[in-house]
Regions:
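A short beta-loop-alpha structural element at the N-terminal edge
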Residues: 2-15
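Conserved GNAT acetyl-CoA-binding A-motif
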Residues: 110-123
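Conserved acyl-donor/pantetheine-binding loop and adjacent beta-alpha core of acyl/acetyltransferases
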Residues: 58-86
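A short, internal acetyl-CoA/4′-phosphopantetheine-binding micro-motif in the GNAT/acyltransferase core
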Residues: 85-94, 123-124
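C-terminal "cap" of GNAT-fold acetyltransferases
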Residues: 144-160
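Conserved acetyl-CoA-binding loop-helix of GNAT-fold acetyltransferases
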Residues: 89, 95-108, 136
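Active-site rim helix/loop that mediates acceptor-substrate recognition in acyltransferases
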Residues: 24-50, 64
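Conserved active-site alpha-helix within GNAT-family acetyltransferase domains
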Residues: 124-143
């Protein structure tokens, strides 16, 4: 497996495919929405294996023109942060450490920026695997945000 690399517009079809495999936890997006997210991202990294792109992460800084209510929740409460909008790993590559490698790069980037990392995890519908993943990577719960039928747990990872 190679090191993390910068994502490009050529990666969008595979990113959408991987994202679809993570539903409902990742949230559905079109090819255009994924391209828009890529353009807004402070950090957009992918990891390849022998089959090509195996996982990716997209992160945003505060004050970005992005319509996510979850992102807005952090914007209203924190001045500085690196927001993980989505991290997704292909079905065939899960449990192989790709998510952890991507998060190591996210955490290192946040350290360089001297800011915490933020993310949300679906509470309704539940995503227990993501809860465990974020706990393993040093994230703490800082709130719950509910919108209609959905609810998410808000997480932050500060430098220890």
């Amino acid at each position: 497996m190679d090191a993390c690399r910068a994502l490009t517009l050529n990666d969008i079809p595979r990113m959408v495919e991987i994202n679809e495999q993570g539903l409902p936890g990742t949230g559905k997006v079109s090819h255009q929405e994924m391209a828009d997210l890529l353009g807004l991202s402070e950090l957009a990294l992918g990891l390849d294996n022998e089959r090509g792109l195996a996982g990716f992460v997209l992160c945003l800084l505060p004050g970005t023109r992005y319509g996510s209510l979850n992102y807005a929740w952090f914007n209203q409460r924190l001045e500085q942060f690196l927001y993980v909008d989505r991290v997704a790993v292909a079905d065939e590559a899960r449990n192989g450490g790709i998510g952890s490698l991507l998060y190591q790069s996210v955490i290192a980037h946040a350290h360089r920026l001297d800011c915490p990392v933020t993310a949300e995890v679906s509470l309704r519908p539940p995503n227990p695997g993501s809860v465990r993943f974020h706990a393993r990577h040093g994230f703490d719960e800082i709130g719950v945000f509910e919108t209609g039928q959905k609810a998410v747990t808000m997480y932050i990872r500060k430098e220890k």
